[in-house]
């Protein structure tokens, strides 16, 4: 049984892609689901159990394995959510407020294109609607959470912290990680100091 990694320095490393190897995928996914079941969680990334490969699992509607997942599209709409993380014990006692895209499109090596989003999108934000009970939205948030892990991003990082200011008004440190969007719609995570010159070329912080 692999233990859950809690060392932030290790967790902030960007992992490498998993080479095509079905037997290795099966071994890693089995270890992930075993750890996930023990911890009673919703999702887990390979680097959370000490395997620095781009792979994660989700278990909400049904068990799902994502090999080399990459978010290729995000909705413009976002939602404030509350998240905890098995690798950050303090957040299990005191969850963090975060902001997540309402829907995302993920490309994977094993499942092809996967769409994540709420089951009742038209009800999100309406009076009296408990969107925390929407399994589709929960699955979407967990997918973003786990893919963040693979990119070395934690829910305690400034990029994920809930902030009522508009993005354009936020203040970033030179080494803070931000997500930028190119004029072509591609997104990637880079340090703010590297993002600044790109803003003049039509890139946006999202």
Residue ranges and their predicted role:
Residues 1-206:
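Positively charged
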């Amino acid at each position: 049984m692999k233990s859950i990694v809690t060392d932030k320095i290790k967790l902030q490393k960007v992992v490498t892609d998993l080479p095509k190897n079905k037997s290795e995928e099966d071994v890693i996914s089995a270890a992930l689901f075993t750890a996930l079941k023990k911890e009673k969680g919703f999702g887990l990334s390979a680097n959370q159990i000490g395997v620095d490969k781009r792979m994660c699992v989700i278990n909400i509607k049904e068990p799902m394995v994502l090999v080399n997942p990459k978010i290729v599209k995000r909705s413009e709409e976002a939602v404030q959510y509350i998240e905890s993380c098995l690798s950050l014990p303090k957040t299990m006692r005191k969850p963090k407020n975060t902001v997540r895209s309402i829907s995302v499109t993920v490309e994977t090596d094993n499942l092809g294109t996967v769409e994540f989003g709420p089951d009742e999108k038209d009800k999100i934000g309406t009076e009296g609607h408990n969107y925390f009970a929407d399994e589709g939205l929960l699955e979407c948030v967990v997918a973003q959470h786990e893919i963040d892990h693979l990119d070395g991003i934690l829910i305690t990082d400034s990029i994920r912290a809930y902030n009522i200011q508009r993005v354009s008004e936020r203040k970033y440190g030179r080494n803070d990680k931000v997500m930028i969007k190119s004029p072509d719609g591609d997104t990637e995570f880079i340090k703010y100091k590297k993002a600044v010159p790109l803003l003049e070329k039509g890139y946006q912080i999202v």
